[in-house]
From Swiss-Prot:
Keywords: Cytoplasm, Protein biosynthesis. Its main location: cytoplasm. HAMAP family: Rel_fact_arch_1. It comes from Thermococcus onnurineus (strain NA1). Directs the termination of nascent peptide synthesis (translation) in response to the termination codons UAA, UAG and UGA. It is found in: Cytoplasm. InterPro entries: eFR1_2_sf, eRF1_1_Pelota, eRF1_1_sf, eRF1_2, eRF1_3, Peptide_chain-rel_aRF1, Peptide_chain-rel_eRF1/aRF1, Ribosomal_eL30-like_sf. Heterodimer of two subunits, one of which binds GTP. Belongs to the eukaryotic release factor 1 family. It comes from the Archaea. This is Peptide chain release factor subunit 1.
Amino acid sequence: MSHKSAEMYELKKKVEELKSYRGRATELVSLYIPAGYDINKVMQQLREEYGTAQNIKSKSTRKNVLGALERAMQHLKLYRKTPENGLALFVGNVSEQEGVSDIKLWAIVPPEPLKVRLYRCDQTFVTEPLEEMLRVKDAYGLITVEKNEATIGLLRGKRIEVIDDLTSNVPGKTRAGGQSARRYERIREQETHEFMKRIAEHAAKAFLPLLEKGELKGIIIGGPGPTKEEFVDGDYLHHELRKKVIGVVDISYHGEYGLRELVEKASDILSEHEAVKERKLIQDFFRHLVKDTGLITYGEREVRKALELGAVDTLLISEGYDKVRVKAKCNACGWEELKTMSEQEFHVYKKKLTHCPKCGSQNISFEKWDVAEELIKLAEESGAEVEIISLDTEEGQQFYKAFGGLGAFLRYKIQ
């Protein structure tokens, strides 16, 4: 996985976190500074906003907005100039308790250049410009064709989506002879022709907008018999879409299963596509498991140990993996406890651990960090590859459910 892909994964996690917060009033500050923009002008704008915020009537809202702006200005002093891809700052009071201030700041240098300049103080953080970066743009058009049905879909990233299911009125073959047979065959040919035109119209509606945006990388067509070749060779598809046909494949199924089979059968054509690479990767992981080669491991403790030893060749993390690492510490006697748990379990743990089990003090502090981000950092430090496994493929779902979404290919066997 490229460094950019790892950045995209971490960005997605941060966006999800930011979207989970809601202010008690319009007191959450979002600031987008585009690539190449003068950071001194931003500082000037924030000073002006600070002056305006002093007129806010609500005492608590005024305090929180001023506190957020102070944190933002303090942070911007760390930069001599705007980072190469721009900078997004999110600051605000995220405390769940009324009257308690917990102002946090997130500074994000995005993996792609920011083009928008924005300042907003609202009840929620503005994440849309970052979400647009996360949207998978490259797509492959998929069409399965039979005499009496067709399915149009898209392969976008690792997800196959059905756009249209079409059925025809093409009659079956008849045993009648003579003129009746010839007339029946003409009707059949005409109905087939009309159905092909309808498939092409729906394909144009689905694919041409993507082509205009430069997002359509190719079209793959499949079916069980000669109908697919008739569709491709006939003058049905829009001339610009005909140029994008990169493969015609024999398949047995139709509908959503047909689209899945089409992607699988076209794996040579799509060898560099994410969904095909992911399927092969997880199949290799399962193969090592069945053969008991000792060259894979899974589970947080085992993967962490392998990373610390520098034994990991490729780290596999599911998009669904959401564990956090929590350190509880007694500030009176120094007692510490380190655990891995879900975000929900952390809230329960925090509520229950009111007294130090060693000295009874209530002076307990908690530190929390994302396990996936920690393991990615360990992988990068040891030169290991990182692959993010989606939940959009059957293999990705199996990896998440059977192995908790965490595994690794090893460079060598470890004890």
